[in-house]
């Protein structure tokens, strides 16, 4: 058995986004429920830990996955919780792969956290270029809540 940790919010402000990511992981697991390693076939089991969309809960959820002896971790939706949990995964030597956590700080200085998505600075540049080329825009206004990790 290969156990993959699912480090996602199923509750809190980002719960809806976390559930969408989990649906994708569940679909992939349903389509490919086994993996061949060194000539042996293993069943893949998803092990869930709700980080609650909260940095303090994220550390507890990360520790829970470490204690459940997962082989690697997928997640999370939301960079703030990924940044908070990063040291836990790093200290345990447990690889984590961020699916949509776009903040560069998620992987900075962490040999065990990786990502499969674009970084915030890249996305910002692409959007600015698009707005300028498509609409001749020269100014942009963003509204965001200072309380979210994306604006800090």
Question: At which residue positions do the language-model features occur?
Answer:
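Short beta-strand segments enriched in small/hydrophobic residues
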Residues: 1-22, 29, 76, 140-148
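Immediate post-signal peptide segment of exported/extracytoplasmic ligand-binding proteins
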Residues: 1-6, 37-43, 132-139
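Short, charged loop segments at secondary-structure junctions
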Residues: 110
